[in-house]
């Protein structure tokens, strides 16, 4: 059997195992013949998606029906709910008898095949033997985290967050396997650029890529300058395109918690750093210059940097009450 056939078999088997396990949560989402979202966040996502698909309100980024009477900006960016609404409308155009909630509650289960394919692609990019890839796929299928993210009714956006984590790793590895191919660098930049449109915090995916390039720079083993510049340009432009539909961005807001000018600023920093690494060779003088530039660029977002550090170190009391911040293994035992 060829390697491609083995990888295809691993993907199919592991995806079906993961999907079957995720279907175990059906009883939490199917009550008295009615499909319902599983959890508070999933409920609000479903409400916003259904409004965008069928209601006169259409798609909204400011909700005047929450935090009454003043209303509130929705911290979740536009892309996930908008695309889900478009997907629902398209599906019902072909299959008009489909129950809208039946469709939405099962999207996370179907999406297992996408995330599993990316995981297999990552393992293949690492040149692992097929039995190791099979073991990784089985671990993904049996993981409580997979069941938590992909369970029936989990309309929350977290399974798509996982998609972008895997997509960035996959595109980065493919590029580094063939660093001369500028098109692969561009795909990495696009993945990094559009990720915040699905969750504000996904701009953080730029950090490990920058760290990786910084290590290559110190070792004098960077990819060619053309590929580096292609990465920088595609990252900035795709971020800008992802920001254009965002009302907070068009209103001139600069907030970490909203898809705004903050995210374009982060992309600009990453673009500048990548360009500097591509233009200047490593030495003590250039290292000092790069460090100085980095510190100056952090000043406008220093408060957000401190807040992010507190989040990573779990120095926020509120985290104890947020399900997403808890161990998936604890969840699997106590559910």
List the predicted regions and their residue ranges.
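Start-transfer (signal-anchor) and selected internal transmembrane alpha helices
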Residues: 1-29, 134, 276-294
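Transmembrane catalytic cores of multi-pass membrane glycosyltransferases
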Residues: 161, 186, 191-335
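Membrane-interface coil-to-helix junctions
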Residues: 16-114, 143, 156-159, 163
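Membrane-embedded helix bundles of polyisoprenyl
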Residues: 14-22, 107-126, 131-176, 181-217, ...
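Conserved acidic
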Residues: 10, 177-179, 222
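Alpha-helix initiation and N-capping motif
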Residues: 46, 80, 132-135, 315-316
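Membrane-helix interfacial "entry" motifs
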Residues: 3, 65, 73, 93, ...
């Amino acid at each position: 059997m060829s390697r491609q056939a083995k990888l295809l078999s691993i993907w199919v088997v592991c995806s079906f195992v993961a999907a079957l396990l995720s279907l175990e949560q059906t009883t939490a989402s199917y009550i008295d013949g009615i499909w319902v979202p599983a959890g508070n966040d999933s409920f609000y996502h479903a409400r916003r998606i259904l409004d965008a698909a069928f209601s006169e309100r259409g798609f909204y980024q400011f909700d005047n029906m929450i935090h009454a009477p003043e209303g509130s900006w929705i911290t979740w960016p536009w892309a996930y709910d908008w695309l889900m609404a478009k997907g629902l409308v398209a599906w019902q155009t072909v299959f008009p008898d489909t129950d809208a909630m039946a469709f939405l509650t099962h999207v996370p289960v179907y999406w297992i095949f996408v995330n599993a394919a990316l995981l297999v692609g990552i393992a293949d990019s690492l040149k692992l033997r097929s039995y190791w890839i099979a073991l990784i796929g089985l671990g993904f299928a049996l993981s409580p985290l997979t069941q938590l993210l992909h369970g029936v009714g989990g309309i929350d956006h977290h399974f798509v967050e996982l998609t972008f984590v895997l997509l960035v790793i996959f595109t980065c590895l493919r590029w580094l396997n063939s660093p001369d191919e500028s098109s692969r660098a561009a795909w990495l930049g696009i993945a990094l650029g559009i990720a915040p449109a699905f969750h504000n915090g996904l701009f953080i995916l730029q950090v490990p890529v920058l760290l990786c390039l910084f290590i290559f720079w110190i070792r004098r083993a960077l990819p060619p300058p053309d590929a580096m510049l292609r990465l920088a340009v595609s990252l900035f432009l795709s971020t800008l395109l992802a920001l254009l539909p965002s009302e907070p961005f068009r209103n001139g807001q600069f907030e970490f918690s909203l898809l705004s000018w903050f995210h374009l600023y982060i992309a600009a920093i990453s673009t500048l750093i990548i360009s500097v690494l591509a233009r200047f060779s490593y030495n003590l003088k250039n290292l000092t210059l790069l460090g100085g530039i980095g510190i100056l660029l952090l000043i406008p977002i220093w408060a957000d940097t401190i807040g992010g550090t507190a989040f990573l170190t779990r120095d926020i009391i509120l985290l104890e009450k947020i399900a997403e911040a808890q161990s998936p293994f604890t969840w699997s035992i106590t559910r």
